[in-house]
């Protein structure tokens, strides 16, 4: 008799994805982030569902409903802070996951990579709309500033902004629709994750050497299930310490002040995980130019398979490219810091230089370096 996990129509899908999946024998801890992201997504959906049971999407009661969750609901504070800090963990893992993809040349699986880029945009949209829901000062002004960027689109811009707002400013209609979208988008993300995995399992996983590993594969279970559980353990320890010891470490204090349309905060800034893109947006004096740069700062990832000039897939054996990638990481950290600073000298200049170097490294210097490395290896 055939084993049920290999014959049952539903269980065999799980079996081919998580149990008998042939996996390269040499993938490192950098390949743990996929499962960690899946766990984060599940955690966000569960905590979000419980928060939605107590939250009211109305401008008059939204702020006090969040206060009510923290003060009166059993373990409400824990659910709220798990959801808020879980989002930060989600983005940390996302950036590590993308970084690993760039380092080891995983972007050559174009379908998987492009679905991943669309996923990144969707997750960013979800996080932005979630940040608006507590209806604090930064929620309100963040929503006003970011949605207002769409007015830079020629001809249809101003109409589009009012259409998104549901009126002539960010108000009750905006909050209600943002809550609706914030609730539904994670389920769309889950569906897209399944497509992401479907494309990945068509080709099989990449590995640190960047060489085809069909001759050296091992079953996913028990080897990588154990490895993933260890990663999850580290994640939960870190997240628990963050929630229980310093839950507001990554939160803007301005968001503990109820939204007031008549009082603008001194520095409007998004959550830390959007600061690098925000710095790129601010570094261009022209509104439309800034919006294009903002979108392209993420969309540039789609170009990576096209501008890959190296004869090798991975950066494991390309020291110059490695060095450049770490310069890019440092550059992104500088952009993140600049995004949190006021718009004044010297931050404007630093932001502009960091923005230029960000695009130059990816579009010009990295492909040129890869080409040079080919010549050095007489390829």
From Swiss-Prot:
GO molecular function list: metal ion binding; ubiquinol-cytochrome-c reductase activity
Main location: mitochondrion
UniProt: a ubiquinone binding residues: 201
Transmembrane segments: 33-53, 77-98, 113-133, 178-198, 226-246, 288-308, 320-340, 347-367
A Pfam family it matches: Cytochrome_B
Keywords of the record: Electron transport, Heme, Iron, Membrane, Metal-binding, Mitochondrion, Mitochondrion inner membrane, Respiratory chain, Transmembrane, Transmembrane helix, Transport, Ubiquinone
Residues the entry annotates as binding heme b b566: 97, 196
Listed cofactors: heme b
Any one Gene Ontology BP term: mitochondrial electron transport, ubiquinol to cytochrome c
Entries under PROSITE patterns matching the protein: CYTB_CTER (PS51003), CYTB_NTER (PS51002)
Cofactor-binding details, from the entry: Binds 2 heme b groups non-covalently.
Family according to the record: Belongs to the cytochrome b family.
Subunit structure: The cytochrome bc1 complex contains 11 subunits: 3 respiratory subunits (MT-CYB, CYC1 and UQCRFS1), 2 core proteins (UQCRC1 and UQCRC2) and 6 low-molecular weight proteins (UQCRH/QCR6, UQCRB/QCR7, UQCRQ/QCR8, UQCR10/QCR9, UQCR11/QCR10 and a cleavage product of UQCRFS1). This cytochrome bc1 complex then forms a dimer.
Further comment: Heme 1 (or BL or b562) is low-potential and absorbs at about 562 nm, and heme 2 (or BH or b566) is high-potential and absorbs at about 566 nm.
Protein name: Cytochrome b
Organism: Phyllomys brasiliensis (Orange-brown Atlantic tree-rat)
């Amino acid at each position: 008799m055939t084993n049920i996990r290999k014959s049952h129509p539903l269980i065999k899908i799980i079996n081919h994805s998580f149990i008998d999946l042939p996996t390269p024998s040499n993938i490192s801890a950098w390949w743990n982030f996929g499962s960690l992201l899946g766990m984060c997504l599940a955690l966000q959906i569960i905590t979000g569902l419980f928060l939605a049971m107590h939250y009211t999407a109305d401008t008059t009661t939204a702020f006090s409903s969040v206060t009510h969750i923290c003060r009166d609901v059993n373990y409400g504070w824990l659910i709220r802070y798990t959801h808020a800090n879980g989002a930060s963990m989600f983005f940390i893992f996302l950036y590590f996951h993308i970084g690993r993809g760039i380092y080891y040349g995983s972007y050559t699986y174009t379908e998987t990579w492009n679905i991943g880029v669309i996923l990144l945009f969707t997750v960013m949209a979800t996080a932005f709309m979630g940040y608006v829901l507590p209806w604090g000062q930064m929620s309100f002004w963040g929503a006003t500033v970011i949605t207002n960027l769409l007015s830079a689109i020629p001809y249809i811009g101003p109409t589009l902004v009012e259409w998104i707002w549901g009126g002539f400013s960010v108000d009750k209609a905006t909050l209600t629709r943002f809550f609706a979208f914030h609730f539904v988008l994670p389920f769309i993300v889950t569906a897209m994750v399944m497509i992401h995995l479907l494309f990945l399992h068509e080709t099989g996983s990449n590995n640190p050497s960047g060489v085809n590993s069909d001759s050296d594969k091992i079953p996913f279970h028990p080897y990588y299930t154990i490895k993933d559980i260890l990663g999850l353990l580290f994640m939960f320890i870190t997240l628990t310490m963050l929630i229980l010891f310093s839950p507001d470490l990554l939160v803007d204090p301005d968001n503990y002040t109820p939204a007031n349309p008549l009082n603008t905060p001194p520095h409007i800034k998004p959550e830390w995980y959007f600061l690098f893109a925000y710095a790129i947006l601010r570094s261009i004096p022209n509104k439309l130019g800034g919006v294009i740069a903002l979108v392209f700062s993420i969309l540039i990832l789609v170009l990576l398979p096209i501008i890959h000039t190296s004869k090798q897939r991975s950066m494991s054996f390309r020291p110059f490219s490695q060095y450049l990638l770490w310069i890019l990481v440092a550059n992104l950290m500088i952009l993140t810091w600049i995004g949190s600073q006021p718009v004044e000298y010297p931050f404007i200049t630093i932001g502009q230089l960091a923005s230029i170097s960000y695009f130059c490294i990816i579009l010009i210097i990295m492909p040129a370096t890869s080409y040079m490395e080919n010549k050095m290896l007489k390829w």
